[in-house]
């Protein structure tokens, strides 16, 4: 699932192909990986704050969240619980109203979200929020959010790096969802115990923080933008990989099992 698709959509696709995941038989959260995506974004944002701002907690941290969908709103909930001060915008006014009501967030317009004097800008809407029109408005020292393809071009990543803005690469930050999908598929394997799902999933999502720290450290040491280092780390892991697990088909009998663990 992603923007514009849902679990029912994926189930419909499963009538035509076995190459799908994120379905209701695989986890107690209905197969929707967005809870894991959101928690991974929270872990990533926390790691970025620790590295850049040398802070051990998020109390009083000012965060601007662009987009309050399935992932963005859950991220806002995690941040609110951690004591952060939230500034939010969304194209759906009801989502903004809910955040104001439930999370004591401050509502701003889509145009204002970029220029706020905040610690973190968390893009959680559609792609390319960092572009020619917005990059000079940013006052945040950290960019960490769930949106895909956050940099309109690589040049924008170079600009952020040159200005000392810590950019947490998008496909690392939002990896929680695909990690969840991996373990949902793995539960279909006869040699994997579904009882391990929650523990294994949580450990891997928390591990996103360690990956980001490696990227941040190498970026600073080499004076190379984080998005470049992220690609290098990914390539290194691909090249060094030896155990390529393949799941069974979703129409196998194992796919009909029910599971008691949830994310």
Feature names for model-found ranges:
Residues 1-54:
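Glycine/serine-rich phosphate-binding loop and adjoining beta1-alpha1 elements at the start
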Residues 60, 91-173:
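Rossmann-like adenosine-cofactor binding region
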Residues 3, 31, 65, 69, ...:
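Hydrophobic alpha-helical scaffolding
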Residues 32-120:
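Glycine-rich phosphate/diphosphate-binding loop of Rossmann-like nucleotide-binding domains
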Residues 1, 52-62, 89, 110, ...:
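Flexible, glycine/charged-enriched surface loops at secondary-structure junctions
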Residues 141-260:
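Adenosine-phosphate binding glycine-rich loop
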Residues 10-14, 38-46, 76, 93, ...:
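Predominant activation on well-ordered alpha-helical scaffold segments within soluble catalytic domains
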Residues 70-77, 134-136, 157, 240-246:
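Short glycine/threonine-rich loop-to-helix capping motif typified by GTGT followed
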């Amino acid at each position: 699932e992603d923007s514009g698709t849902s679990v029912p959509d994926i189930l419909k696709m499963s009538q035509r192909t076995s190459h799908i995941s994120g379905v209701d038989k695989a986890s107690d959260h209905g197969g929707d990986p967005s809870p894991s995506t959101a928690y991974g974004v929270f872990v990533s944002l926390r790691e970025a704050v620790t590295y850049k701002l040398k802070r051990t907690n998020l109390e009083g941290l000012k965060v601007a969240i662009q987009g309050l969908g399935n992932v963005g709103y859950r991220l806002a909930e995690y941040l609110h619980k951690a004591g952060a001060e939230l500034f939010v915008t969304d194209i759906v006014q009801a989502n903004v109203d809910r955040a104001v009501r439930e999370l004591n967030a401050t509502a701003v317009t889509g145009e204002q979200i970029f220029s706020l004097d905040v610690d973190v800008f968390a893009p959680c809407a559609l792609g390319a929020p960092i572009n020619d029109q917005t990059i000079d408005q940013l006052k945040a020292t950290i960019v960490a959010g769930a949106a895909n393809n956050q940099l309109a071009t690589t040049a924008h990543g170079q600009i952020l790096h040159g200005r000392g803005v810590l950019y947490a690469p998008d496909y690392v930050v939002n990896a929680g969802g695909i990690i969840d999908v991996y373990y949902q598929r793995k539960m279909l394997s006869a040699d994997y115990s579904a009882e391990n799902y929650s523990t294994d999933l949580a450990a891997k999502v928390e591990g996103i923080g360690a990956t980001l720290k490696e990227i941040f450290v190498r970026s600073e040491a080499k004076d190379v933008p984080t998005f470049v280092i992220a690609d290098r780390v990914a390539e290194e892991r691909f090249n060094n990989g030896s155990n390529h697990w393949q799941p069974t088909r979703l129409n196998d009998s194992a796919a009909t099992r029910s599971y008691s663990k949830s994310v």
